[in-house]
Amino acid sequence: MNIKLTLLVLISIINLMIIQPIQTLAFPIYAQQGYENPREATGRIVCANCHLAQKPIKIEAPKTVLPNSIFEAIVKIPYDTNNKQLLGNGIKGSINTGAVMILPEGFKLAPKNLLSEELREKTKNVYIQPYSTTKDNILLVGPLAGEKNQEIIFPILSPDPSKDKNIHFLKYPIYIGANRGRGQVYPTGDKSNNNPIVSLNTGKVTKIISLEKGGYKIEIEKDNGEIYTENIPQGLNLMVSQGSQVVANQNLTDDPNVGGFGQTEIEIVLQSPSRIKGMIVFFFTVTIAQIFFVLKKKQWEKVQAAEINF
């Protein structure tokens, strides 16, 4: 199983590198490699450690589901499709998306052979994988081309308490984390080029040198007369010019990040079929009783009217 999973991941990565060679920072696999569980004890999903900007996401799923049934959980990752992100080589490219879904124990990705034709069509070309062989209730997907995947459909199979005594007919939480665009920090802790460059010291910009391969070198004279150099990578726009006065931690460039990460949660009820049948019988009985009560009341009113007339 581990070999098959590894091969599938490698094939996915190779395909993505061929199609989108630079868009690698949205890989949820980074969380997979670094954390046994993507949700910390505080409730924070670890993807937020690399994707520092916060952006909204939404999830749509049924309020209740029956055991051993397949349902859709739709994750919505909105963003302006006119925006382009800064890629690793300093050029602008399309934004990608990715998501992690943490299901209750027993819930898992629905096998493809159980999907309806409609659901199979909706989820084609979207590779969703379990977080690990021991955590098949945690699902990962991405990176995906964002233009076509601002909505990601997860086909979920609910558990059956009659087959698993650890599962009960209860209300359960589902946790979702999703990102659009690249992160600002690598798993190693190093910053990516998807950050603004800030001045390390207070001083004056004395020289700006445009580099042949793109980017700049900025020479800044500190208050004590010492000159130091700030290196600006390709793709960032300068916010200072020669002669500008700068202070420590002032942005020398714009912020290239157009993406961000968001997380949310919903609740879903695993409903007992016998309870539903019982409720139907109860409501049917109450309805019949009310009908008989109304008929009896009308009959009594007729008797009363007849006695008055007599």
From Swiss-Prot:
Parts of the chain that traverse the membrane: 276-296
Cofactor note: Binds 1 heme group covalently.
The protein, known as: Cytochrome f
Stretch forming the signal peptide: 1-26
GO biological process, one term: photosynthesis
HAMAP family given in the database record: Cytb6_f_cytF
GO cellular component terms listed in the entry, alphabetical order: chloroplast thylakoid membrane
Gene3D superfamilies: 2.40.50.100, Cytochrome f large domain (2.60.40.830), Single helix bin (1.20.5.700)
Alphabetical keyword list: Chloroplast, Electron transport, Heme, Iron, Membrane, Metal-binding, Photosynthesis, Plastid, Signal, Thylakoid, Transmembrane, Transmembrane helix, Transport
